[in-house]
């Protein structure tokens, strides 16, 4: 009986191994390019409703909580400002200060010089309560914290969607990286929406912030814009109140203009304070009244900043609604182009 030589056996074994490898590769390619198909429109729609929509709902809820936290933090910050008012009123109503302010205010009304006395009061206010620079920095710090929360929520949403796609055998033969494409596409749409927001400057500024997320320039721009609107709102309220405070406040706002929008708000406070002192200089309850009026002014400033339609919180709320509206089709588009 004829036997196969060892070299022949080795060659045959190698041929069989090569054949098996080739067959495996062919089967693999056949499966993924032939019998393996991408999800149908119906399958994709079902997946989106059952797996993606709950994730988007959770993201909306998390963003709402982040905005509520920002609102609470702003309130807490203004509570700190209000807590410092008694020190300021005790300082400003001391005999020397009260006499100086009253005398300078009378001269101001007669001469039209509306700066000197407000500067004195502004210095006292900034020393005891809050400076224009510190107020702006405080608001920017809080807003940056909000941006970090929104960014964390966005990243969590994308990771959860990626995991859902990976776990669903009908969706894709490979995992996807939404974060690689989402930021560019969603930010492009947000920026475009901001350009098309027309005269809604508050919404446009808020959308630009959400598109850049915590970029220092965007944060500063939004805070300054919000403080400008706050100052304008306060000026309207004060002017409607009448009295010496209203007369002097018109000039008081100009004292802080060099320090930006927060300086404008502090300048308005100074004008009000001078007016209250002049109107009540002979009253033995001046300090108590001034304490009440200063606290009320800060409360109105907080309300304007957070509750007005174009205030910081309300404009961010509208921007979040718009962002949530456009991110759904962006994600759906990424699912449509899955292999």
Each model region followed by its residue ranges:
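Amphipathic, membrane-inserting segments
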Residues: 19-22, 26-29, 60, 64-65, ...
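An N-terminally focused, membrane-permeabilizing/fusogenic/translocator signature enriched
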Residues: 19-136
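Pore-lining and gate-forming transmembrane alpha-helices of multi-pass membrane transport proteins
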Residues: 200, 204, 208, 212, ...
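N-terminal intrinsically disordered, acidic low-complexity segments at the extreme N-terminus
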Residues: 1-2
């Amino acid at each position: 009986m004829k036997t196969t030589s060892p070299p022949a056996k080795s060659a045959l074994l190698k041929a069989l191994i090569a054949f098996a490898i080739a067959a495996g590769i062919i089967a693999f390619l056949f499966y993924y390019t032939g019998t393996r198909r991408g999800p149908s429109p119906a399958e994709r729609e079902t997946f989106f409703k059952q797996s993606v929509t709950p994730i988007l709902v959770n993201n909306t809820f998390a963003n709402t909580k982040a905005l509520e936290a920002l609102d609470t933090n702003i309130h807490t910050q203004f509570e700190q400002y209000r807590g410092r008012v008694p020190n300021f009123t005790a300082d400003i109503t001391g005999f020397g200060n009260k006499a100086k302010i009253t005398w300078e205010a009378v001269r101001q009304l007669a001469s039209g010089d509306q700066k000197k006395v407000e500067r004195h009061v502004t210095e006292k206010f900034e020393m005891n309560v809050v400076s224009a620079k510190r107020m702006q920095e405080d608001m920017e710090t809080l807003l940056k914290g909000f941006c970090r929360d929104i960014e964390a929520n966005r990243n969590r949403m994308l990771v959860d969607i990626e995991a859902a796609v990976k776990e669903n055998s009908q969706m894709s033969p490979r995992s996807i990286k939404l974060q690689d494409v989402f930021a560019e596409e969603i930010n492009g749409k947000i920026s475009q929406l901001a350009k098309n927001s027309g005269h809604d400057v508050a919404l446009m500024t808020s959308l630009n912030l959400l598109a850049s997320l915590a970029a220092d320039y965007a944060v500063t721009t939004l805070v300054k814009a919000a403080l400008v609107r706050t100052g304008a709102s306060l000026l309207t309220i004060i002017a409607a109140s009448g009295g010496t405070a209203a007369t002097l406040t018109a000039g008081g706002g100009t004292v802080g203009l060099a320090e930006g929008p927060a300086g404008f708000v502090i300048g308005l406070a100074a004008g009000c304070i001078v007016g209250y002192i002049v109107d009540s200089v002979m009253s033995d309850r001046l300090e108590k009244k001034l304490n009440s009026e200063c606290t009320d002014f800060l409360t109105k400033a907080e309300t304007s900043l957070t509750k007005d339609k174009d205030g910081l919180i309300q404009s961010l709320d509208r921007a979040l609604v718009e962002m949530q509206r456009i991110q759904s089709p962006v994600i759906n588009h990424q699912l449509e182009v899955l292999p």
